[in-house]
């Protein structure tokens, strides 16, 4: 088991069982997010870069971070705007960050801001930085819709046309294809299947009923509503919208507590007519951004910061995107805990990304299945079941929302805050992503 000496705020403390030998402790100093809102609503007139700017700016103000202490900025995003292809850099400049501080953008579907965080962790661990802002953003109110390929080829060919007949011919091809635009892909490139279809098949494979999915969705919205009312979402920062009717957006707007009767009346959204995934038990299109300040513990303490949590370890996994697209949590949680020398019982807080209610419940069933764990994970037996009284107690992506590039930081922040409130020691984050990818992160309470 790896051990290293850790310190609490200004004072030495006992060694942590999961700290890595001969490597600096990495800490989450603080994090923020804009309100997560339903796409097409209050943020519909903004660009993604505007939201990421707001998150970075708010984080700097909240932490009182002097720019001379900041080494690098990393942001994740999925559906990119061509004008801001390196959105991290553009957002940083708009936020007033000095142009001498580098910034780059990463992407890995729904775990893009996890990649931003772990990339930063690597830079900190190797001594290439002391302080990094890691975040992410998605704005699905406005996505790049382009002309189809035939129209694009014709447009590019127009420059080579040398006479009027040739130009008229190419012009006809352009006009012919104008009414067939290409929307951003919603299906897996390798399989042609949408995530919703995959979620439906996964729920069926692991015997998750429609009722169980609807009940889990109601649970998510109910817990998120209670958390919001009780002031738990201290990571949310307001966004001021200028215009003819200026207003300030202060809270998430997709949390809606409903009843089982209402949810059961909805028709399947993907596999018709007998599917079980509906608009209510799936996460919705969301606009939002997040940003986290991470440092080495030594640097944080030397400069007067009080960290919220240790970022102890992480692990990425990948599997068959056809049959196991959304099963990453079931693979990564056992592997991550094995790597850390911990057991299921050692974990006090779980934050699992809720792409679909059925996806979360299927992963819980998979980890509690002798057959799955023996056949697919080559374990001696089932790993065990994640207790519901430790899982997503402030709601999750089903209720709070899921801006693809921003969710990872939200998961880390809620884990850190829950550890403090619940007086726990270890938290585990797990999330699936397109391509059959997944991530797990191990977080330890600071000063525990």
Curated annotation (Swiss-Prot):
What SUPFAM superfamilies does UniProt report for this protein, alphabetically?
Answer: Thiolase-like
Note the InterPro entries from the entry.
Thiolase (IPR002155), Thiolase-like (IPR016039), Thiolase_acyl_enz_int_AS (IPR020615), Thiolase_AS (IPR020610), Thiolase_C (IPR020617), Thiolase_CS (IPR020613), Thiolase_N (IPR020616)
Please name the CDD domains in this protein's record.
thiolase (cd00751)
Q: Which GO terms describe its molecular function?
A: acetyl-CoA C-acetyltransferase activity
GO cellular component term of the entry, any: mitochondrial fatty acid beta-oxidation multienzyme complex
Q: Which residues form a coiled coil?
A: none
Q: Which reaction does it catalyse?
A: an acyl-CoA + acetyl-CoA = a 3-oxoacyl-CoA + CoA
List the subcellular locations.
Mitochondrion
Annotated GO biological processes are: fatty acid beta-oxidation
| One protein family per Pfam | Thiolase_C
The EC number(s) given in the record are 2.3.1.16
Pathway info: Lipid metabolism; fatty acid beta-oxidation
Spell out the catalytic residues: 110 (acyl-thioester intermediate), 402 (proton acceptor), 432 (proton acceptor)
Q: What class of enzyme is it?
A: transferase
Q: Which PROSITE patterns does the entry mention?
A: THIOLASE_1, THIOLASE_2, THIOLASE_3
Which keywords accompany this UniProt record?
Acyltransferase, Fatty acid metabolism, Lipid metabolism, Mitochondrion, Transferase
Purpose of the protein: Mitochondrial enzyme that catalyzes reactions of the mitochondrial beta-oxidation pathway.
In the record, the note on similarity to other proteins reads:
Belongs to the thiolase-like superfamily. Thiolase family.
Q: What is this protein called?
A: Probable 3-ketoacyl-CoA thiolase
């Amino acid at each position: 088991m790896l051990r290293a000496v850790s310190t609490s705020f200004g004072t030495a403390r006992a060694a942590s069982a999961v700290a890595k030998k001969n490597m600096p402790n990495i800490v989450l100093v603080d994090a923020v997010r804009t309100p997560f809102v339903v796409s097409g609503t209050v943020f519909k007139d903004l660009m993604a870069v505007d939201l990421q700017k707001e998150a970075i700016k708010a984080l700097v103000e909240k932490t009182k971070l002097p720019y001379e202490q900041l080494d690098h900025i990393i942001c994740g995003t999925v559906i990119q705007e061509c004008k801001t292809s390196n959105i991290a850099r553009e957002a940083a400049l708009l936020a007033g960050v000095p142009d001498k501080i580098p910034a780059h953008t990463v992407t890995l579907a729904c775990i893009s801001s996890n990649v931003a965080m772990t990339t930063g962790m690597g830079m900190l661990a190797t001594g290439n930085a002391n302080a990094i802002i890691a975040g992410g953003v998605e704005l699905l109110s406005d996505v790049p819709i382009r002309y189809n390929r035939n129209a694009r080829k014709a447009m590019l060919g127009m420059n080579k046309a040398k006479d009027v007949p040739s130009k008229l011919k190419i012009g006809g091809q352009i006009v012919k294809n104008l009414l067939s635009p290409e929307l951003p892909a919603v299906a897996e490139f390798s399989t042609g299947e949408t995530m919703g279809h995959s979620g439906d098949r996964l729920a069926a494979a692991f015997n998750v009923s429609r009722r169980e999915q609807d009940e889990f969705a109601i649970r998510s919205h109910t817990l998120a509503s209670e958390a919001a009312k009780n002031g738990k979402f201290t990571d949310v920062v307001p966004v001021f919208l200028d215009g003819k009717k200026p207003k300030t957006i202060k809270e998430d707007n997709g949390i809606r507590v409903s009843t089982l009767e209402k949810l059961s009346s909805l028709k399947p959204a993907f596999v018709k007519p007998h599917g079980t995934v509906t608009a209510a038990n799936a996460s919705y299109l969301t606009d939002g951004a997040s940003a986290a300040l991470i440092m080495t513990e030594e640097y944080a303490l030397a400069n007067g910061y009080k960290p919220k949590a240790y970022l102890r370890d992480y692990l990425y996994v990948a599997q068959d995107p056809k049959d196991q697209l959304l099963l990453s949590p079931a693979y990564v949680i056992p592997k991550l805990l094995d790597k850390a020398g911990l057991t299921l019982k050692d974990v006090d807080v779980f934050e699992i990304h809720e792409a679909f209610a059925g996806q979360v419940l299927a992963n819980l069933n998979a980890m509690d299945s002798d057959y799955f764990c023996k056949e697919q994970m080559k374990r001696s037996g089932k790993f065990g079941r994640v207790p519901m009284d430790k899982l997503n107690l402030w709601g999750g992506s089903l209720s709070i929302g899921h801006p693809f590039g921003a969710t990872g930081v939200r998961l880390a922040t809620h884990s850190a805050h829950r550890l403090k409130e619940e007086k726990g020691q270890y938290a585990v984050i797990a999330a699936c992503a397109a391509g059959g990818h997944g991530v797990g992160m191990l977080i330890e309470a600071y000063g525990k």
